[in-house]
Amino acid sequence: MRGLLRKWLILGVAFLVLLPPPVPAHPDTGESKSLSIVHLGDSYSSGNGLSNHHGPPSCLRSSNTWGSLFASWANSQGVATSYQNRACSGGNIDDLFSPRALPQQSAKEVAANSIEEARARLEETDACSARAAGDDLLSVNHHLRESDGLLLWTRKYTYECQLTVRAQTDFVGPQTDLVLLTAGGNELGFTDIIANCFGPRIPGALGGANGTKCREGVAATTSGLPEMLDRLKSQISRLITERMTGNPKSQVILLAYPLLSLDRPYHLPDGAVSYDAARGVRELGRAAIREQRRIIDELENDFPGR
């Protein structure tokens, strides 16, 4: 990890055009160079919002992620590169080695004479988009129940689709040369921090930015960084020792999150004083990067060259 991983632990994705590819599976031999990449993590890896989504609907995987761009670049450099995106929006550290029940989809209705017929109809029409989940899919729960109203000749049933997907590391194996990863943001409540520090006020939906909640959230998240990163370190250790066993030069690249505020003051009322939310959130981001560097150093000591 040392050197390569340290260079690649940066903010953003500009590194795609600046850095050399990692060591391929067959370096400095007469064999063709190849690279097997698996991308794991949360929305920063799945590509939430980048369009061209595929896979389990709630995962919001895009074909335009930074990992996909890197794989395309590596192919252009003559390295035969395969790429799998198994990251999932909303994912957390535990999802790396554990199945995950995705959020329930919005409630809909289906007409049928019985609950068995309703379930069969949903499966036949792929009402839950289970086919899109492909080999990620473990199970589908329709959460079927009979609706109150009756149609003239049949019953109505309400269903709320919920898919359960496999652990992300199920797709990492001895053949994997490189794992790309972002993880930890959802555990630390980054969504709440953004809402409390910069969110608009929407009556009945969002309370808007609040200086006290922002300050307290930043402080609580900062104090939780060491424990959370230690958990992530443990998962990366498992990844290397239990999954990435085929290539002694295989690597894990942990990418830092971008700083979530601009480098200019953004003051919020905080009791009798004010709180600079922008500064607090940027300091939190820098603290997270320092903790990531700490566990990287420790992992490099445990797994030299990985």
Give the positions of each predicted feature:
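Secretory targeting and sorting signals
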Residues: 1-27
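Short, well-ordered alpha-helix to beta-strand connector turns
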Residues: 14-15, 34, 80, 175-176
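Serine-esterase "nucleophile elbow" of acetyl-processing enzymes
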Residues: 30-107, 111-114, 198-205
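Short, well-structured alpha-helical segments in soluble
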Residues: 99-175
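Alpha-helical cap/lid subdomain in secreted, periplasmic
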Residues: 146-306
